[in-house]
A protein has these predicted regions:
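Substrate-binding/active-site groove segments that recognize
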Residues: 58-76
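Compositionally biased, proline/threonine/alanine/serine-rich low-complexity intrinsically disordered stretches
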Residues: 9, 15, 19-20, 77, ...
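Catalytic and binding regions of secreted/periplasmic enzymes and modules that target cell-wall glycans
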Residues: 92-133
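Solvent-exposed loop/turn segments at secondary-structure junctions
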Residues: 48-51, 70-73, 118-121
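Export/targeting segments at the very N-terminus of extracytoplasmic proteins
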Residues: 10-50
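Bacterial N-terminal signal peptides
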Residues: 1-8
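Solvent-exposed, polar/charged alpha-helical surfaces in well-ordered, non-transmembrane soluble domains
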Residues: 20, 24-28, 37-41, 68, ...
Length: 144
């Protein structure tokens, strides 16, 4: 009877179980990019529920559901398969999230929205020298 009670109280497998497998990688990526760990976890829950091999609609990949073009704009040289590797995905996803975090002035809700909708296009539109001018990728503002 004690065994049955213990099993009934045991947590079910789900996002929380998967989360712990990536805690150390998430902490390192967050630290390297100057963003709160909780923000990274929030984006991962929203985007993939800790499913590293998830391929989403619109060509988004891995834990943070990052696009290949976005990762490449941040220096990634591999293919889409590489973005399914949790460490690689976090390296580029958190780097992109850091830009959204800075643009949101540290506001987590806005940072999540900017990350989800693609803040680079908004940044380019706001900082284009004149309407119709060719746009180049502008660097994100430096962290304070």
């Amino acid at each position: 009877m004690v065994t049955v009670a213990a099993l009934a109280l045991a947590p079910s497998a789900g996002a929380d179980d998967h989360r712990h497998a990536y805690d150390a990688m998430i902490a390192a990526a967050a630290r390297a990019n100057g963003v709160p760990e909780a923000l990274v976890h929030r984006v991962i829950v929203r985007e993939s529920r800790y499913q590293p091999r998830l391929i989403g609609q619109g060509g988004v990949y891995g834990l943070m559901q990052i696009k290949l073009a976005t990762a490449r704009s941040l220096g990634y040289r591999g293919d889409t398969t590489g973005l399914l590797d949790p460490e690689t995905n976090l390296a580029y996803g958190v780097k992109y999230l850091a830009g959204a975090w800075r643009m949101a002035d540290g506001n987590e809700d806005r940072a999540v929205r900017y990350y989800a909708r693609g803040y680079n296009e908004n940044h380019l539109r706001l900082h284009s020298p004149r309407p119709g001018a060719p746009r180049s990728l502008l660097p994100a503002p430096a962290a304070p």
